[in-house]
Swiss-Prot record:
Its EC number is 2.3.1.86, 4.2.1.59, 1.3.1.9, 2.3.1.38. Residues 1132-1612 are annotated as: Dehydratase. PANTHER family: FATTY ACID SYNTHASE SUBUNIT BETA, MALONYL COA-ACYL CARRIER PROTEIN TRANSACYLASE. InterPro entries: Ac_transferase_dom_sf, Acyl_transferase_dom, Acyl_Trfase/lysoPLipase, Aldolase_TIM, FAS1-like_DH_region, Fas1/AflB-like, Fas1/AflB-like_central, FAS1_N. Residues 1506-1634 form the MaoC-like domain. The gene is FAS1. This is Fatty acid synthase subunit beta. [Alpha(6)beta(6)] hexamers of two multifunctional subunits (alpha and beta).
Length: 2037
């Protein structure tokens, strides 16, 4: 039976459960009920201030609550449970636990709450504290030096609240001490009752807060002095008791102590106390002494009132309430002493002020009368910078002071002469009360001279008194003793002495711990809090403060090859000496100095500011890379204030880095980018480090913010201050660094480099060593490196001209203190001017630069409204100075001398341009862009002076200007007037526009004096010093030469190699360090395997099982270790080849740097292991493959300094594992890049690996494949099993692919890749296709069924032939295009087109080619000239002499390449085709072109200029979505192995994590072919309704990676048509990223479709006109026919359709009219006479040779007249067809039929049996013959018509036979013509033709049958047929009689089952018209040429009206036609059928 029960405390959502004894459960429950009542109602969200925030706080509050109750057992049990649960059984301290709660995001809380709920209640309940050795005290016994300090007055106004909090939290620990002290104070203070007007009962004030005096009373020194001491004693007591130590035991851990001002008393107290008794005794002495000190000081220097105005003024200026002590910060002692001297000079001695506390180098306190200190403040205000004043552009020495001065809340002038009298009184009190401190066991240091009190001969207490009252505090002296951890016991917390001391001690290795404050550590962890004292942990870890000198000072290291380096953070980062050359224009623009510096072993920056385009910079970088040692990297410097350059510079760097260029760093000068921009640089550019050059304290802060945002990325902070050469700030070099050094060093990733003013080892060594700062009274502040600029300008490799170099040597320079004089005058040969960017810039004070300075001071500083006036006034002076002294002379110059531009002739302008921009001496232009500018000006001259149009330009190419003098002379001979004509105003503007044109080199002259003068004067002003030949008179004094005023001191030689300059400095540093650090013994320098790169890290990965033996085994289960820790673990701590290989960030490939693949390959994987042989260091990695742990990576040293990395793949074609070997050279001489890949045969090794992978190890590897020949694949029989496995792998569930009996089993289109894989993939193996297969990307894939070919199916025997269509070098890599053709029984079935891309950069153009089937082009010839141009082309061969207006060209080309833009050869051949009017296409010519080196293809150029492409797809304006997309969501497979197996594509990037990692892929990417197949299956389903055969083509581009289990969403849209097939656009996106992964296009055949053309009867006015207006194609059909009608028959068919006139007159005037009349006369038709004989008659009997006009008349409109109806309807249908055909809507294999008249439209449209003109002739003739075939009255009306009949409307039983019966009997009975002529829809729609009377009779007979419900069918069953006829005749007779009685001709009306066809007055298709058949047949024969009838267009497609069956070319079909027609021609064919076979 359990003896415990769970007991739960809850508050809102917070709960805590503990097990309590059964016998106490009731008591617990009672206490809980009472406790809950004390809690407020729970709040939602964050807990309120009075609520517990966590289970621990809830439990703590409960423990505090029950500690007041009478249940000691419960308290004890609960406390034990609390300690067990939260304090790890007291292995953790309550303070540490409380601080941890502050970082708990689950239960947010505050420091106040954890103090109240945790700390207070814990100590309320705890009865005893065991002795615990904290981590800190443990280290005190070993390596830590712990000291204690105590503060003084003035830290805070509310110091008493600190004591109150202590009493609240730790009452039980300090109660006894406080009682004793309170008693002592109560004994003493009555003696000073006039002072202690409100008493001194501190215990009462603590217990009863309402009795606490006001703040003024508490701040009075008699009260504050003893109470502050009480606070410190309490803190000390709490510390000892929490640790379980006596004061003596804790003191033994302290090395020394001291106190600030009165804090000395407490320091002496703890030093003299070795037990609680002695501590109490000494504590009472201390508070007694301080009571006397406070009282006597006040009585000696009483507090007096101040004038209200003084008080208010002081408060208004933020200086606080005047008191006897004033804090002054951020001024040096010298500066403050100067102000004191000024102030005291106006005061009597007793009012003097003095420095009383020197807290730090720039932290002082003054003591004196408040009025005097107020006067000091007034004096300081005059020179103090107001808040917000921007002084960044003011020289540092001239700036107003930035400082803080504020009165302290201390009301006695401590540490000054003003308290001398108080000293004596205090000492009397001491003697009177017998106070003393004896037996100090640890040093306590004097605050005046830093001496040890233990050595004092006078009484310690006497010295203490004097140190508090009179002697100034030198706090740095007092604390200048060894310490690693300093405990500040208050008061004041973060406002107290600890933080002040931290500022002094920062960087010295002393960590400040605020022993009196509990809080979480600050963000930067600058100092610690109370909990650090008590922290306990198994690892005994404590925090240490940085020691700048120890950690950052330079040391030496020697690599395995004996080379010595100065080791700093900078040199460790670079693996080079810690010296660099800064990017500076123009010096480091040139590649010589950059290459030389790098090869000498020193980092240097290419000055990007000297380049104006990406091409220029790339060319320079290529040059550098080709000249430097492999592994070396360069830096690039860009100017932040030049946004134009950044716009192209940053993308260029990114692009080059991605290509592997060894660009190591980017430095941004002249501004610090924002964090966002810097982040882009850091994350996107692939740099080793980012250099930033801040120019001010604020800018340094920006750099720090950037570094903090990227704590693991190196930021090189280059500090140059204002003394640097070239552009510079206004800053002092030292002061900003002193101010910001500690903040900089808190960012471990910042590398600090000093620059400017340096030139030797001697002047730079103090900065590397850090001792430079000591002269400013700061601890050593080492820099990590030094940069040089001016110093290298005279180097041999510098392009600085010799004269400029000599001028630099002549400059003497100045020391640091004098450089600011350059702002006003030449100093050391240097002066500051304002650059084009408005920034200060140092230049040598040449004549030209002094003129620049003059203009800066007199012209360029003027506002715009005064500028022009000043320029005009000084015009002559400025022009003279330009011509005599400056590098850019005045442009204007004519025969008379100096002039303005507008006073020059065109020729003079041209000559002047040549004079100033062309360097005659060396026969070159200053820059090619200036040559081109000159060319543009000459072309303007040509435009002005060329008199005739069509004149060929003299300047065809700018290269003609390479020697401009002769060309210019010849040029102006052609245009003599240009030598006389002054340049026009318009051309002046054009000239100035050219001169200022962006993108070209700025002009070397000044053309104008206006607001643009400064631009022309200053722009591009630095290059001249490097190219004196281009300067007038080669006068160096005209030029601008950048140089630093301080650095100038060190340049004494000309043409010293840069390597020698830098080596001498580096070797000087080495010699100095050997002497100082290694006692002159070089052998003591530590030796390492290599130097540079990452330091080895000692780590312990907790989730890794390590087995140690002959080989170390590292095993990973399901929990993964941190990647970096894992790599560090594998690398080990020993520097060797394996450590270098694993840890290096870069691998050298040739001249390129690529990221280390091991970082990805060795990424920790679940259930894997790694073994490392201890002896050989061979590493083998194993991973789980199908349940087995198999080796996947091996790394070993195969021979000295040669490493082999093998990647092993087990999933192969023959299942045998294959290894891919990579070879590397280990170069320990270069620690920055110690691993160089051996590139020889690398690609071949990779190809051989893939060959074995895809084809099997038994197939011999061969790269001897001819790229110009077809690659043959194996013959394969398609089986149902392979189809099934494939469809299963891709998830295609289409029924067509399922093997079932009785049907063919189709193979998916994608199956072609399985068939053709080996042939297609062999195309990437030829030796000439050289590329890295691991960088191969499948770009696209496409399938296309051959026209007419059936899909692949089971049982097909197929083979593949692959052809390489293209091998192209592109910017993104090498493109290989392969077309594989699948053959079945020797016939092509399908084409598979795949494009692959070898990512990278390739230049082997000799191996590249492209075979192109050019897009067919039609060329229209509008003139004889056009024809002549074509005939003149050598490549055009006309083979038939025919007339043509339009030709079609179908060509194929083969291109071979010489370079990216030049072909080595071109061959183009093809057919030239002509379409005849009959639509027949014949070849009339050919194209045959072949050429060698070419820049273009003249054939395609001609066709693209003159023609238009055809056979292109037609894209809809608005796409039609096929699905919403949601239902097309799919998931990528979790593994790619099934597809790899069925497809044969074993590329390991799809199945192997290791290979995918090597290829820099985010995972094993899904096969592109799988994605293609699975998405195509969706197309099959959604766009082809699961009819597989309808998908005729599918192509897709793989635009994004798909990873296992990715969720994909596909959308489909019907976007257009091509040749009658739907174009379906497919897009598949990754659902999570929303990025596209596949974009495809499918061609879907439409379902079997028959096109039907309507007949007569459907016409209406305006028909087809909407389409006519919107479709160009339709309009062309109408217009062509209309022209034919107008020209041949004199009327417009368009007019008839649009307006439907009732009559139309044709006039026969003129020759054209007569020809039209002849056409009418010639129209004949044949009829059968009464005698039965055939006779011919004119259709238009009224027209003869004398007729002048003819009028067509129709009462219902001419459109209803048959002769017009028929051509109009035919044209409407033809136009509609041609329109949809033009839109690609017509499939190639369709059936068609025409209803009646529509048969003509059908045949002419789909079978092209006649041109449009013949078509309209035929139907017009047909209409006319029919129109005249029936008699008509005078109104043109006939007695014939047609009706539509629906028998089903008569009755349900009235069917086809019934209708036929009734029609026949009506005809028989009436003898009128009545026939069914159209059988449209059985039982529903028929058309009857005949006599109107007969039609009317039929209508009404059917009405009678319906009304009377007479069932003819039933009657036929019930009686004989004769009887039925008899009854029917009765009805017919009655109805016919009524029809005869109606007005004739009858106007037919609608019946129940009959609808009249209005407008038809001819009995079409009836026997009545039989006589017209033969003549019409003869007419048709004339109009339909035999050549236009193509059987293939008719067989199986054309459904004639006659047969209602698809046309066949068979004897049976012809027989059926004969049976229907009795045609003699058909009979003749049948009789002679054998002849036709």
């Amino acid at each position: 039976m359990s003896t415990h029960r769970p007991f739960q405390l809850t508050h809102g959502s917070i709960e805590h459960t503990l097990l309590v004894p059964n016998d106490l459960f009731f008591n617990y429950s009672q206490l809980k009920d009472e406790f809950i009542k004390t809690l407020p109602e729970p709040t939602e969200g964050f807990a309120g201030d009075d609520e517990p925030s966590s289970p621990a706080e809830l439990y703590g509050k409960f423990i505090g609550f029950i500690s007041n109750a009478q249940f000691p057992q419960i308290v004890e049990l609960s406390l034990k449970d609390f300690e067990s649960r939260f304090l790890d059984n007291n292995n953790d301290n309550i303070h540490s636990f409380a601080v941890k709660l502050l970082d708990d995001e689950t239960y947010p809380t505050t420091i106040a709450k954890v103090k109240e709920n945790i700390v207070k209640n814990y100590y309320k309940a705890v009865k005893s504290i065991n002795k615990v050795e904290s981590n800190l005290l443990y280290h005190c016994k070993h390596d830590a030096k712990l000291v204690a300090i105590f503060g003084g007055q003035g830290n805070t106004d509310d110091y008493f609240e600190e004591l109150r909090e202590l009493y609240t939290l730790y009452q039980g620990l300090i109660e006894d001490l406080l009682v004793s002290i309170a008693e002592k104070l109560n004994q003493l203070h009555p003696s000073f009752d006039k002072i202690y007007t409100q008493g001194l009962n501190i215990l009462s004030w603590l217990k009863h807060p309402e009795t606490t005096p006001d703040q003024d009373y508490l701040l009075s020194v008699p009260v504050s002095c003893p109470v502050i001491c009480v606070i410190q004693l309490c803190h000390y007591t709490i510390t000892c008791k929490v640790l379980g130590l006596t004061p003596g035991e804790f003191r033994n851990s302290l090395k020394w102590s001291t106190g600030h001002s009165q804090g000395l008393v407490t320091a002496v107290t703890i030093a003299a106390s070795d037990s609680w008794d002695s501590f109490l005794k000494n504590s009472l002495t201390a508070v007694s002494l301080l009571l006397f000190i406070g009282s006597r000081c006040l009585s000696t220097y009483p507090r007096t009132s101040l004038p209200p105005t003084m008080l208010q003024d002081s408060l208004d200026n933020g200086e606080g309430r005047p008191s006897p002590m004033l804090s002054v910060r951020d001024l040096s002692i010298k500066q403050v002493e100067k102000f004191i001297e000024q102030t005291n000079s106006h005061l009597p001695r007793e009012k003097h002020i003095a420095i009383s506390l020197i807290n730090g180098a720039r932290n002082l306190v003054l003591s004196g009368p408040p009025e005097s200190l107020y006067g000091f403040n007034l004096n300081l205000r005059n020179q103090k910078a107001p808040m917000g004043l921007d002084q960044s552009r003011v020289p540092f020495s001239e700036r107003k002071l930035k400082c803080s001065n504020r009165f302290l809340p201390i009301f006695a002038p401590f540490h000054s002469h003003l308290l001398a009298d108080a000293t004596e009184l205090i000492l009397d009190d001491v003697k009177e009360h017998g106070l003393s401190f004896e037996g100090l066991k640890i040093p306590v240091y004097d605050t005046f001279d830093g001496s040890d009190f233990q050595a004092l001969k006078e009484p310690i207490i006497d010295r203490v008194v004097k140190l508090i009252t009179e002697l100034p505090v030198h706090w740095e002296e007092a604390t200048n003793h060894k310490a690693t951890h300093i405990l500040d016991f208050g008061p004041g917390g973060v406002s107290g002495l600890g933080v002040l001391t931290h500022r002094n001690k920062e960087g010295t290795g002393a960590r400040i711990i605020l022993a009196g404050t509990l809080d979480s550590n600050p963000i930067d962890d600058e100092y610690g809090f109370k909990h650090e004292i008590f922290q306990t942990s198994a690892d005994k870890a404590i925090k240490w403060a940085p020691d700048w000198l120890k950690e950052l000072r330079p040391t030496l290291v020697k690599n395995s090859e004996g080379k010595i380096y100065v080791k700093t953070k900078f040199s460790q980062l670079l693996g080079r000496a810690p010296l660099m050359v800064a990017g500076m224009t123009p010096t480091t623009v040139n590649t010589d100095i950059v290459s030389a510096s790098l090869n000498a072993g020193y980092h240097i920056e290419l000055a990007g500011g000297g380049y104006f385009s990406p091409v220029m910079m790339t060319r320079a970088i290529d040059d550098i890379v080709s000249r430097i040692k492999p592994g070396y990297g360069l830096g690039i410097n860009l100017i932040y204030v030049n946004p134009f350059m950044l716009q192209w510079g940053i993308p260029l760097i990114k692009d080059l880095r991605e290509k592997g260029y060894p660009i190591q760093s980017l430095t941004i000068g002249a501004g610090v980018p924002s964090i966002e921009v810097a982040t882009e640089y850091i994350e996107d550019l692939g740099l080793t480090h980012l250099g930033l050059k801040p120019g001010s304290v604020d800018a340094i802060s920006q750099v720090i913010a950037i570094a903090k945002a990227h704590p693991t990325f190196p930021i090189v902070l280059q500090w140059t201050g204002g003394r640097g050469g070239g552009h510079h700030s206004f800053e002092d070099f030292h002061q900003p660094i002193i101010q910001m050094y500690s903040k900089i060093r808190r960012c471990s990733n910042i590398v600090l480099v000093a620059g400017s003013g340096f030139g030797s080892d001697e002047d730079t060594y103090p900065y590397l060593s850090g001792y430079w700062s000591e002269k400013f009274n700061y601890p050593p502040m080492p820099f990590d490196g030094v940069l040089f600029g001016s110093r290298v300008m005279t180097s041999k490799e510098s392009h600085t001209s010799l004269a400029a170099k000599k001028l630099i040597v002549e400059c003497k320079g100045v020391p640091d203190q004098q450089w600011e004089q350059t702002y006003k005058k030449p100093t050391g040969g240097i002066i500051t001017v304002r650059s084009e960017m408005g920034e200060p810039i140092h230049k040598i004070a040449t004549r030209g630069v002094m003129f620049w300075k003059e203009l800066d001071d007199t012209i360029f500083n003027l506002p715009k409204n005064k500028l022009l006036d000043a320029l005009n006034k000084k015009r002559d002076h400025i022009i003279k100075k330009l011509n005599n002294d400056f590098q850019k002379p005045w442009f204007g110059k004519n025969a008379n001398g100096v002039c303005d531009l507008q006073e020059m002739t065109y020729k003079e302008v041209a000559n002047r341009l040549v004079e100033l921009m062309y360097v005659k001496k060396s026969h070159r232009w200053i820059d090619v862009s200036l040559r081109n500018m000159y060319g543009d000006f000459l072309r303007r001259v040509e435009e002005r002076f060329t008199s005739s149009a069509g004149t060929v330009s003299l300047l065809q190419n700018f290269n003609q200007l390479n020697e401009p003098e002769q060309f210019t002379a010849d040029f102006f001979e052609k245009f003599p007037q240009a030598g006389k004509q002054l340049i026009s105003e318009e051309d002046c503007d054009y000239f100035l526009m050219l001169a200022a044109r962006p993108g070209q080199k700025p002009v070397p002259f000044v053309p104008v004096l206006d607001e643009r003068f400064e631009f022309f004067f200053k722009k591009d002003s630095l290059w001249q010093s490097e190219d004196l030949e281009s300067v007038v008179d080669e006068d160096v004094q005209r030029t601008c030469i950048l140089h630093g005023p301080v650095a100038s001191q060190y340049t004494s030689k000309v043409d010293e190699p840069i390597g020698d300059i830098l080596n001498s400095i580096h070797e000087g540093h080495i010699a100095r360090l050997i002497k100082e650090e290694y006692a002159g013994d070089e052998s003591k320098i530590p030796v390492v395997e290599y130097f540079g790169g990452k330091k080895p890290a000692s780590v312990s990965a907790t989730s890794v099982n390590i087995i140690d033996g002959n080989q170390v085994v590292y095993e990973i289960d399901s929990e993964l270790p941190n990647k970096q820790e894992w790599l560090d673990l594998l690398a080990g701590t020993e520097l060797n080849w394996l450590q270098a290989f694993i840890s290096t960030d870069r691998i050298v490939q040739g001249s390129k740097h690529v990221s280390n693949p091991l970082h990805d390959i060795l990424t920790p994987a679940k259930h894997s292991k790694v073994t490392i042989d201890k002896k050989t260091k061979k590493l083998t990695a194993f991973e789980n493959i199908k349940g087995d742990l198999l080796p996947v990576v091996e790394i070993e040293l195969v021979k000295p300094n040669t490493i082999q990395l093998s990647l092993i793949e087990h999933r192969t074609a023959d299942t045998n594992p294959v290894a891919l070997p990579f070879l590397y050279k280990y170069n320990p001489a270069d620690g920055f890049a110690p691993i160089l890949e051996i590139m020889e045969d690398r690609n071949e090794r990779i190809k051989e690996f893939y060959w074995k992978l895809w084809f099997g190890s038994s197939v011999p590897y061969s790269n001897d494949i001819n790229v110009e020949k077809a690659i043959l694949g194996d013959e394969i029989t398609i089986s149902s099993q392979t189809i099934s496995e494939f469809t299963h792998a891709i998830g295609n569930k289409c029924d067509a692919f399922v093997d079932r009996p009785g049907k063919a089993t189709l193979a998916p289109m994608d199956f072609a890749i399985v068939i053709g894989w080996k042939a297609i993939i062999k195309a990437i193996f030829p030796k000439s296709v050289d590329g890295d297969l691991l960088k191969l990307v499948h770009l696209s894939n496409g399938y296309k069924m051959i026209t007419g070919a059936a899909p692949l199916k089971k049982g097909d025997v197929v083979s593949t032939k692959a052809e390489i269509k293209a091998v192209l070098n592109q910017p993104s890599g090498k493109l290989v295009e392969v077309v594989g053709t699948i053959y079945r029984e020797g016939k092509p079935v399908m084409e598979v087109t795949s494009q692959f891309l070898y990512r990278g950069e390739y230049n082997d153009y000799c191996n590249t080619f492209q075979k192109v089937t050019e897009t067919p082009v039609q060329v229209a010839f509008k003139s004889a000239k056009d024809l002549a141009v074509l005939r003149s082309k050598e490549w055009f061969h006309l083979e038939k002499d025919v007339q043509f207006d339009v030709l079609t060209f179908r060509c194929e080309s083969t291109y071979k390449f010489k370079s990216a833009n030049v072909y080595s050869s071109i061959k183009t051949t093809g057919q030239v085709l002509l379409e005849l009017p009959t639509k027949e296409v014949i070849q009339v010519g050919s194209v045959d072109y072949e050429a060698g080196t070419s820049y273009g293809n003249p054939v395609t150029d001609y066709l693209s200029r003159n023609g238009k492409t055809i056979e292109e797809s037609v894209i809809f304006e608005n796409a039609i979505p096929l699905s919403s997309g949601e239902e097309l969501t799919s998931k990528a497979p979790g593994t790619n192995e099934p597809y790899a197996i069925v497809s044969g594509d074993y590329n390991p990037i799809h199945v192997s994590r290791v290979f995918a990692a090597y290829a820099k892929l985010p995972g094993t990417i899904t096969h592109g072919m799988y994605s293609s197949a699975s998405i195509r299956a969706l197309v099959e389903e959604w766009a082809a309704n699961n009819v597989a055969a309808r998908v005729r083509a599918f192509k897709c581009d793989f635009v994004g990676m798909v990873l296992p289990n990715d969720t994909l969403q596909t959308t489909m849209e019907h976007v257009g048509m091509i040749n009658g097939r739907k174009i379906i656009k497919v897009e598949t996106r990754n659902v999570e990223t929303e990025l596209p992964v596949l974009i495809g296009e499918a061609e879907i055949e439409q379902p079997t479709t028959t096109y039907v053309f309507t007949g007569q009867g459907s016409q209406e006015q305006g028909m087809g006109m909407e389409l006519y207006n919107s479709s160009e194609v339709a309009r062309e059909v109408w217009d062509k026919a209309d022209r034919h009608f107008v020209n041949n028959y004199g009327f417009s068919i368009l007019d008839i359709v649009q307006n439907n006139p009732n009559e139309l007159t044709i006039h026969f005037g003129g020759a054209k009219g007569r020809a039209i009349r002849d056409n009418y006369i010639g129209m004949m038709f044949e009829t059968i006479g009464e005698d039965g004989a055939l006779k011919s008659e004119k259709i238009f009997k009224d027209i003869d040779e004398t007729t002048t006009s003819y009028t067509f008349v129709s009462p219902t409109g001419l459109l209803s007249a048959t002769q017009f109806t028929q051509p109009a309807l035919t044209l409407m249908e033809k136009a509609a067809y041609e329109d949809i055909k033009s839109k690609g809507l017509i499939p190639s294999d369709i059936m068609f039929a025409g209803h009646s008249l529509g048969e003509y439209s059908a045949l002419s449209s789909l079978a092209n049996v006649m041109p449009i003109e013949s078509l309209v002739d035929v139907v017009f003739y047909r209409g006319m013959t029919m129109q005249v075939a029936v008699p008509r009255d005078e109104l043109g009306r006939s007695n014939y018509g047609m009706v539509a009949v629906n028998p089903s409307r008569v009755s349900a039983t009235f069917d086809d036979s019934a209708l036929r019966f009734v029609v026949d009997e009506v005809a028989n009975k009436t003898k009128w013509l009545l026939e069914i002529v159209n059988y449209n829809v059985e039982n529903q729609q028929y058309v009857a033709a005949g006599d109107l009377r007969a039609l009317d009779t039929l209508t009404n007979v059917l009405n009678v049958l319906k009304i009377n419900k007479i069932d003819i069918v039933k009657l036929q069953e019930q009686m004989s047929i004769e009887k039925v006829k008899e009854h029917l005749y009765e009805i017919v007779d009655e109805v016919a009689a009524k029809s005869l009685a109606k007005p004739q001709p009858i106007d037919l009306e609608r019946g129940f089952a009959v609808i009249p066809l209005k407008g038809i007055s001819v009995p079409f298709h009836s026997s009545y018209l039989m006589s017209g058949v033969k003549p019409f047949q003869r007419f048709l024969c004339k109009k339909i040429p035999k050549s236009s009838v193509k059987p293939q267009d008719l067989i199986g497609k054309y459904i004639p009206n006659l047969t209602a069956k698809p046309f066949e070319l068979t004897k049976e079909y012809f027989q059926s036609v004969y049976d229907l027609t009795k045609s003699e021609k058909i009979k003749s064919i049948l009789d002679n059928w054998e002849q036709y076979e």
